[in-house]
């Protein structure tokens, strides 16, 4: 509802600016949907929690299709910056049966809070991205860096709106996942870092308690270590 011609013109102008900020590496409209809570609402409506299933959350504007396929245990951190982390888990159905051959598409921001496509002249292409395939037992593991909280892009109309409404633009530390397997519905989700700043005020309303995980100090980066910690 527009109460005046001026408000209508302002709305048209702002949405035009939003479109002009989009390109093949940045989707300002997705970002707008995220910060308005629309993405989270649509996710909640379309992906109601199923018993024993991992909860979903927003996709975000920086997913890249055709990320490189990686060998199990490979490091997705190409520039060696950041605090090393060993990530592991197990993909199962809702009855706990392991799923072999599930694809796990992961991506994250670097220690400075930027995704590779935001810094094409700074980060290696496809830095902190990779696709892994689960083994017979449904398990996966890989090396990366511990995620940190970061600000969403504020150099466009979405940033202007955020600041005009007195909100902060920050997201808590997280790792993105898309998990898919033949015969199963894909899951778009995050794993958030327990204790991270902004868990209770995520700028895009993506946090769910079940998706918060603790990072523990580890000396061994092997599949055996993953077995020990998950047992």
Which role fits each region the language model picked out?
Residues 1-8, 12, 221-230:
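Single conserved hydrophobic/aromatic residue that forms the stacking wall/gate
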Residues 16-117, 203-206, 220-223, 231:
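Beta-strand-rich domain onsets/edges
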Residues 146-173, 178-189:
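A short, solvent-exposed loop/turn motif at the edges and junctions
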Residues 192-196:
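Short beta-strand edge segments in extracellular beta-sheet folds
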């Amino acid at each position: 509802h527009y109460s005046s011609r001026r408000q209508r013109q302002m709305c048209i102008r702002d949405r035009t600016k939003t479109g002009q900020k989009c390109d093949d590496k940045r989707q300002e409209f997705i970002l707008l949907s995220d910060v308005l809570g629309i993405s989270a609402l649509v996710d909640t409506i379309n992906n109601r929690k199923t018993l024993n299933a991992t909860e979903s959350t927003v996709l975000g504007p920086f997913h890249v299709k055709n990320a490189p396929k990686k060998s199990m245990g490979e490091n997705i951190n190409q520039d060696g910056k950041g605090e090393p982390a060993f990530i592991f888990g197990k993909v199962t159905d809702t009855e706990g049966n392991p799923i072999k051959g599930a694809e796990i598409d992961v991506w994250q921001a670097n220690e400075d809070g930027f995704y590779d496509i935001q810094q094409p002249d700074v980060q290696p292409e496809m830095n902190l991205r990779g696709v892994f395939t689960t083994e017979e037992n449904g398990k996966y593991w890989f090396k990366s860096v511990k995620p940190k909280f970061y600000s969403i892009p504020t150099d466009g109309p979405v940033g202007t709106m955020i600041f005009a409404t007195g909100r902060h633009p920050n997201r808590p530390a997280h790792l993105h996942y898309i998990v898919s397997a033949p015969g199963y519905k894909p899951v778009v989700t995050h794993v958030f870092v327990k204790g991270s700043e902004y868990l209770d005020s995520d700028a895009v309303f993506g946090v769910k308690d079940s998706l918060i995980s603790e990072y523990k100090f580890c000396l061994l980066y092997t599949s055996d270590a993953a077995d020990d910690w998950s047992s």
